[in-house]
Amino acid sequence: MRGALGAQQAPASPAVLVAPGDTTLRGSRIAADSVQYSLVAYRGAQQQTIGTAIDVVRLEMRGDVPVIHRVLTVSPGRAPLIDSTVTDARTLAPRRHRNVSPSRLITLEFNGRRVKGSIGPVDVPSLPIDTTLAIAPFDSGNWDLIVRSLPLEKGYAARFRVYDTDSGLREYRIDVTGSATVLGEEAHVVIFTLAPKRESVVWIGKESRRLLQVETMIDANTMLRQERQVR
């Protein structure tokens, strides 16, 4: 099956650099929600459902700070991955991140440029993390919250830097290439670039700002589609 990645080309337009607290970010664009996605792999004419993802977003107050509390549960088999994050709704700056899988436990605390926490197997003492970065990052696990909070329109391009436990400080880029109707909703079509030759096509609802669908080529012949399930 030929996905949208084969038809979309990210233009080489200048991209603005966005950081936590940027005035163009609007955390109010993110609504409380509970969503289930199907994860389907396409290889040629064959397709296989490989799992589901349940994404729960709550808008809460932590003291006098409004936050976005997100819990993402990915179930590719019997042992799910559970990813929990807390993000400042005013600035989209990350505050906390906890990731639990059968093989690894990650805990992170963000405070501007400083990141502290631990990483390691679930059944042995973990390795400490304590680093001060060149700039205050976003959380790589919440890339879509950042994108959904931006002023998306055709021709818009942005870069933003994230912290990733495996590779440290990284830069992501988005290019809005147009619009399409997905799941009965008008959506922005966004090219999301993680690294050279690593791209996904993302569909984000124009009015709802929901993440509707993501397509990623995971090898030369296989596409992974994450698609929102309509209830």
Where are these regions (language model features)?
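Acidic/charged, solvent-exposed loop-and-adjacent secondary-structure segments enriched in E/D, K/R, S/T
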Residues: 117-145
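Residue-level detector of alpha-helical hydrophobic segments embedded in or interacting with membranes
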Residues: 6-9, 146
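Extended non-catalytic interaction/regulatory regions in multidomain proteins
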Residues: 147-148, 152
